[in-house]
Amino acid sequence: MVAKTCGAELKFIECAKDGSIDLEKVKELITSRTKIVAMTQVSNVLGREYPVKEIAKLAHEKGAVMVVDGAQSTPHMRVDVTDLDADFFAFSGHKLLAPMGIGVLYGKEEILEKMPPFLSGGEMIDSVTRTSAVYAELPHKFEAGTVNAAGAAGLKAAIDYN
């Protein structure tokens, strides 16, 4: 929907019959015009792990941001986002047996610093006047409203369990 709204062209990485990805074909898809490369680390359909680290390198060589869906990988394997060099890494808590409605979005600090908040309120505001607001430092800059404390406690317990 976002691509349609802003006129972006979506390109898809095709899988072989065995579910593998040809890195040479990926290399052809990522150009200097590519802004975002988004993919799953492990397929929920095929159960296959993909070469996210190698694809992140290709994306970064062209100046693109790498976004990784870790919903299927985080419950089953140790994930090191810095080793993957993912700019963003997201997973839902319920896949780890945490309560519904909580998840994690990791983002590189230098990217998050440049991003404006998309919600407002609560502790995300450091100071406010009648004409302007100063946002709090990370991570509070993106935490509008009341924190889901019960969900966070459940997520921690689920991570410890896994």
Task: Identify the residue ranges that each predicted region occupies.
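Pyridoxal 5′-phosphate
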Residues: 1-162
